[in-house]
């Protein structure tokens, strides 16, 4: 359904723009330039057409950026809008609120959502992990007898 709003052919300038943004994104992440992530997540191929289906997209994105998010974008075909934030390193629960930006950004997105969305949304505050993808369950299980894999899968 949401693929139907995308163009079957794209202008060369749009393709060049998005390819350049991917390079910018990789560079920003590899060089830990969080403030440049905003430019690395700019898009002209899938977000503008999907904004017609998700009229809240740009109000949520603008609210997150205005509140201090480093980047914000439509995740896949949506409806998830993801904001990248930062704060002090370490245990979130032992830090002073002023060290963290995610709550202010979440509040701004909630307020924008209440104003522009017909349905309520949820905010999930997460953090990146270095582990990557892992197996949660295997059937049949890999673990047998006294040999155990992480998570006992």
What does each model-found stretch correspond to?
Residues 18-23, 29-153:
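Glycine-rich, charge-dense phosphate/pyrophosphate-binding loop(s)
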């Amino acid at each position: 359904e949401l693929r139907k709003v995308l163009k079957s052919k794209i202008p060369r300038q749009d393709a060049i723009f998005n390819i350049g943004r991917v390079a910018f994104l990789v560079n920003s992440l590899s060089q830990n330039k969080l403030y440049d992530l905003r430019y690395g997540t700019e898009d002209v191929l899938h977000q503008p057409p999907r904004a017609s289906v998700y009229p809240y997209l740009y109000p949520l994105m603008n609210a997150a950026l205005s509140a201090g998010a480093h980047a914000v974008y439509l995740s896949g075909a949506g409806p998830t809008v993801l904001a990248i934030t930062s704060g002090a390193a370490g245990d979130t629960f032992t830090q002073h609120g002023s060290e963290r930006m995610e709550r202010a950004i979440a509040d701004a997105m909630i307020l924008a959502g209440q104003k522009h969305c017909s349905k309520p949304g949820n905010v999930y505050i997460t953090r990146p992990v270095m582990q990557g993808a892992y197996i949660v369950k295997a059937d049949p299980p890999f673990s047998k007898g006294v040999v155990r894999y992480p998570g006992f899968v």
